[in-house]
Design a protein with these regions (language model features):
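Nucleotide phosphate-binding/pyrophosphate-handling subdomain across enzymes
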Residues: 4-122
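C-terminal helical cap/extension that packs against the catalytic core
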Residues: 71-74, 80, 111-172
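Short glycine-rich anion-binding loops that position phosphate/pyrophosphate groups of nucleotides
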Residues: 78-79, 105-107, 129-131, 179-181
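Short hydrophobic segments within beta-strands
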Residues: 101-103, 126, 176
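Peripheral docking tails and interdomain loops at the edges
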Residues: 171-181
Length: 181
């Protein structure tokens, strides 16, 4: 099977993260089919779309770097599939200490997600301001059962602020667990 990415050497994608390789392949596979259906997609349009996808779509939070020193990354991965990619990506980072700010909604596979998260991190359990948000105390209890330790914060800004205050420049802060965080 021919790799469609070969048709676009040096293709730059604004979205980062290991899972984007698979997403890129899927999109590039669809382009010839879209052309057959009458869509006029030039190579330049494809390259521009990949390079500026966040600006063009408003998409945020896909392994999005918000800060350096300490590195602060957010990702909207919120299920076992997404968290699997995120934990692989975290293993490839270098840092002194990992700070994980996690919040989830109550209708996801919380046990499955928590089982995948790194145990050596310091956790900041929080919740989004949506009705389906799992209370941070419940999340912390479930996380403790999965071997994850940390403290509770009533909202995302206070969790982020505390993690930043406790971090050194060579640390890594991750924010995720829900699209609403």
């Amino acid at each position: 099977e021919e790799d469609e990415k070969d048709d676009y050497p040096g293709l730059e994608c604004e979205l980062k993260g290991l899972y984007q390789t698979k997403n890129t392949r899927t999109l590039l596979t669809a382009i010839p089919e879209l052309r057959k259906a009458g869509y006029n997609l030039s190579e330049q349009a494809v390259r521009s779309g990949f390079a500026h996808v966040c600006e063009l779509t408003g998409l945020m939070g896909r392994w999005q770097k918000l800060q350096d020193a300490p590195t602060l990354i957010c990702d909207t991965g919120h299920n076992v599939g997404g968290i699997t990619y995120i934990t692989e990506q975290l293993k490839q980072q270098s840092y002194r200490k990992l700070h994980m700010i996690i919040g989830m909604v109550n209708d996801k596979d919380i046990h499955g997600v928590l089982a995948l998260l790194p145990q050596e991190a310091e956790y900041y359990f929080t919740k989004a301001s949506v009705r389906r948000a799992l209370p941070e105390s419940e999340l912390a209890q479930l996380a403790s059962e999965a071997g994850l330790q940390g403290n509770c914060y009533p909202d995302v800004p206070s969790a982020v602020r505390t993690a930043q205050e406790k971090s050194l420049p060579e640390d890594f802060i991750f924010v995720g667990g829900s699209s609403f965080i």
